[in-house]
């Protein structure tokens, strides 16, 4: 071994040692006196390295350019392994001591051409080399010492040249150099691990540099380079011991996982930035994935691949799959100039006046609409009334996506073709479909410009030929007999033949039972029924809320709507000023309270003091309260002077909370069910207030027992309705009521709930008018339920009541 500043020599037999020593002594003289302050050959051969890539061609190279020394930072693993390059590229680490020596492993590591190439760069850093301090190393009888680092560059370069020339020119030296030198040293596992770590680090650095340099190069070259690197890594792993191989593979896996995590984080950041930009802009933008167009293709495919006998069950599943529960399907016929309202006959004049197409902006009133509940029955009727297939020819799509997730698919030109057995109906227009985030249809709008009815030639040709033959026969008869010689019988026969041929032609044209719009009569009838029922929904709600029959509702509903329209507008304005949604049901409840004579403070209304509960509970309590007031009015007018003795047994069977008080209503006695109801009440509710007891004992001298709290209850009802409107907007408020307010509320609620539990006393025989008035409210509610059930049975075949009507849908938004 040589010192850290000397060249690299190999210790062989005596001849090779004497050969090297002779050249060293001839070039520099005495090793101790060859240079001032210099230790002999270690100072001059700092740029000398031996390369033995092949044993048959040993070469000693000398680099002519001065540079840093290649000492302990250079690695020679075997006499057969080569280091190409020289001094300018091999840099010495400053951390290596001048007297440090490098120990080489006993088992060499071979780097083939396919494995790794070391050219012009140091493989092992000097800081990681295990140093061994040895005062001197004997090399062929001449001592070799090390020079200080500051004096290594003072050796003249000509000496190295002469030494190399003398070495190559001597033929004896070549034969001696063919002998294989050997290096004997001990195994050092720590050094191998350090070498592996440094090699991996250098490989990562080189890989990053190459990737940065090759970003703009050919991708095929990059693929080939990656494949070559993989092969080199595999070969290198195979050459390693099993333990080191496992460790290296684990390190590579950890690095790959870290890279994947970094890429995933970068992708998430990009998506978040895009989402923030979409939320900031909020406007439509092109959506290149065409996901809505593909969804429409799926819709058409499943519609065409329907079962041969498609029932209502299949169409309900179909509509549920592709349509949102709040979906609507609209057809606009505003561009039909020769078609009036009578052609469709769907909506009343009030409804058609409010019709407006969102695509063309027309307010002609010609068009119709179907909601989610009607679509299953509508599809069944359409394909059961003669439609064999329905085709849709689409132009260039325009697909947009908004920041809220709503996607709009629009076709400026769309052709819909309905295929019947003997006719084809072709409609051309503008189609726009709005999809939700779940890719379900929210709105289907088709603005039709015109339509054509196409008949096959084979259907019309026989009748036309027959008519032509009859006309030719008539003409021949006239030619033969003249205009004056035609007999009356022949003229009548020819006329009958012409009429028969004309009727046959007209029959072939009108056998499909289509109207002027190209729709089947049964299809239009279903639309009519659904539209009528939808328009009557408000009146049905009015019947249910007011507990009146249909005939009385028909009499009073138009006047109520006409008189209540300004009040409804006032309610809507007040709700908008309070920041509440325009809930029709809640506004109708408030209108009912106001029409019944209850004073609603419109200016000082606040959400505080409202009772918790759902909108259904508020509507139920309000309905019970109204029914109770109506029933009390009838009973007060008819039974004010009637006295009924109460049975002691019934008094004893009553609830303890009501003992010692007079009956709630004259002419009626307690039912045993009162005790059952009161037993389920809370203790707080079972405590009657003093005002309640005082009022019930003096019924004949003053209004009913709970009349003193009617005003408080009215205010509570109003507050409750306002609070339910606020809760539907996302807010909630629960305020505690006072004890007197709760007792008053319980009093009225119990009266309303248990009004059917009171039975007339046996001593009283009510007259016809009393019986009618006493059970008027119950009869009206029963009649209303019967009428609604009969209506559903009558319209059941047409599929109007196939699904439950969702009150939250709000009906048609284009209606007033």
Curated annotation (Swiss-Prot):
Keywords, comma-separated and alphabetical: Developmental protein, Differentiation, Flowering, Nucleus, Transcription, Transcription regulation
Cellular location(s): Nucleus
Provenance organism: Arabidopsis thaliana (Mouse-ear cress)
Tissue: Expressed in young flower meristems, ovules and the carpel margin meristem.
Motif Nuclear localization signal: positions: 316-330
Domain of life: Eukaryota
Protein name: Probable transcriptional regulator SLK2
Nucleotidyltransferase recorded as keyword: no
Consequence of gene disruption: No visible phenotype under normal growth conditions, but the double mutants seu and slk2 show severe embryonic and seedling defects characterized by a loss of all structures derived from the shoot apical meristem (SAM). Enhanced tolerance to salt and osmotic stress conditions.
Gene Ontology biological-process entries: cell differentiation; embryo development ending in seed dormancy; gynoecium development; negative regulation of response to salt stress; plant ovule development; regulation of response to osmotic stress; response to aluminum ion
Lineage: Eukaryota, Viridiplantae, Streptophyta, Embryophyta, Tracheophyta
Record's subunit section: Forms corepressor complexes with LUH; LUH is the transcription repressor subunit and SLK2 the specific DNA-binding adapters.
Function of the molecule: Probable transcription regulator that functions in the development of the carpel margin meristem similarly to SEUSS (SEU). In association with SEU, supports organ development from meristematic regions by facilitating auxin response and thus organ initiation, and by sustaining meristematic potential through the maintenance of PHABULOSA expression. DNA-binding adapter subunit of the SEU-SLK2 transcriptional corepressor of abiotic stress (e.g. salt and osmotic stress) response genes.
Statement: the UniProt record of this protein carries the keyword Disulfide bond: no
Family in the record: Belongs to the adn1/SEU family.
Signal peptide from the UniProt entry: none
GO cellular component, one term: nucleus
Polar residues biased stretches: 139-153, 166-176, 644-662, 672-711
Region feature (Dimerization): 307-554
A Pfam family it matches: LIM_bind
Region (Disordered): 133-153, 166-189, 644-711
